[in-house]
């Protein structure tokens, strides 16, 4: 049995921080200590920001993004290319694509992937909303920006089947060698995908 090194309030803070993706028990302890040491500069503003986020953040009823407005900033931006719809698994994927700033398109967040083993079926995802958005018209291309996992690819195939009969071009992200990547460090699946999706030079 491990010794208690702090009071229950600090232990609870560490336990909660450890639940944040990317933070294990050790990182959570470091983060908790840092927050406590920087109470005025960091801890108090952080708790205020978290309370405000909890009160104001909502899920966009159009695309599934999270924002302080509904519809979200992306959906209400008139400069967005409304004919292109990028389908992502989660909000974190949407944010990653936005950071890349490669396309000024609109998005649709599925809320996960099909996973029969985990009990996640089509009705558990925002697929009906996607089909409805496309059926309303105005979308000419759907980009399936899902992960290259078994579940991600199964979800992409299912969505493609659901879009049959609608006048929309369905594309997917290219898979292959990352920018700055060295072939020797890539796995066989990535190399095979890169060879199959090769382009003219």
UniProtKB/Swiss-Prot annotation:
Entries under InterPro entries matching the protein: DNA_Rcmb_RecR, Rcmb_RecR, Rcmb_RecR_Znf, TOPRIM_dom, TOPRIM_RecR
NAD found in the keyword field: no
ZnF bounds (C4-type): 60-75
SMART domains, A to Z: TOPRIM (SM00493)
Pfam families according to UniProt: RecR_C, RecR_HhH, RecR_ZnF, Toprim_4
SUPFAM superfamilies named among the record's database cross-references: Recombination protein RecR
Coiled coil: none
Keywords tagged on the record: DNA damage, DNA recombination, DNA repair, Metal-binding, Zinc, Zinc-finger
Stretches assigned to the Toprim domain: 83-178
GO-annotated molecular function: DNA binding; zinc ion binding
Protein's GO biological process: DNA recombination; DNA repair
PANTHER family registered for this protein in UniProt: RECOMBINATION PROTEIN RECR
Function: May play a role in DNA repair. It seems to be involved in an RecBC-independent recombinational process of DNA repair. It may act with RecF and RecO.
Family, per entry: Belongs to the RecR family.
Matches recorded under NCBIfam families: recR
Name assigned to this protein: Recombination protein RecR
Phylogenetic placement of the source organism: Bacteria, Pseudomonadati, Pseudomonadota, Alphaproteobacteria, Hyphomicrobiales
């Amino acid at each position: 049995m491990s010794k208690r090194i702090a009071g229950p309030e600090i232990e609870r803070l560490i336990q909660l921080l450890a639940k944040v993706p990317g933070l294990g028990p050790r990182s959570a302890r470091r983060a908790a200590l840092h927050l406590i040491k920087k109470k005025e500069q960091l801890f108090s503003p952080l708790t205020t920001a978290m309370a405000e986020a909890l009160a104001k953040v909502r899920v966009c009823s159009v695309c599934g993004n999270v924002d302080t407005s509904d519809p979200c900033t992306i959906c209400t931006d008139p400069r967005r290319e409304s004919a292109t719809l990028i389908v992502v698994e989660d909000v974190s994927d949407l944010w990653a694509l936005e950071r890349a700033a490669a396309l000024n398109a609109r998005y649709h967040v599925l809320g996960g992937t099909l996973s029969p083993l985990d009990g996640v079926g089509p009705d558990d995802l925002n697929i009906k909303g996607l089909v409805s958005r496309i059926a309303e018209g105005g979308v000419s291309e759907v980009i399936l920006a899902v992960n290259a996992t078994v579940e991600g690819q199964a979800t992409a195939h299912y969505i493609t089947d659901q879009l049959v009969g609608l006048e929309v071009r369905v594309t997917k992200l290219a898979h292959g060698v990352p920018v700055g990547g060295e072939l020797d460090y890539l796995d066989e699946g990535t190399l095979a995908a890169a060879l199959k999706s090769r382009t003219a030079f």
